[in-house]
């Protein structure tokens, strides 16, 4: 029997095949426990394997442009767990995503901005939501541009993908042609997004923010 990649990571962590900390183990245990609970009618949520695999498959169509030679993306098991959990868990009533907020903490050079770039590109153009707004934010514009530039690299390294987006570097905006959504990089000037309703808000380097005002505006 083949197990989906999200669940396989959880099983491997709980079997000590993958070294992980207590919080990761708790998230994996929750995943397994909730899959069992989902079999009962009163439980509000279920795990949609197709939706989980869909975003992981999307990630693996992308190209890593940085370096001497371009390489196809191969998602690591922990990345599969993050992506699959966020997109796969759904409400039984309405098929809405279960998780509206996530906190992802990774060590330096472990692909945090890369992962955020995947989420922004996917939810910007391939999630069927029309006229959405996706914000890549940080305390400073240079930091916000790191995630934005990850998306730009994905687009520029793939001729098919480049047909689906239009990049406006002068104002740090990407038009999503399929959904008519926009992806935009913003700095800690919170007034610039006050009143907007983001479909996806990414707060990069959250620990560097002096308060949670940006997070609250994106909620």
Map each language-model feature to its residues.
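Phosphate/NTP-binding elements of NTP-utilizing enzymes
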Residues: 2-219
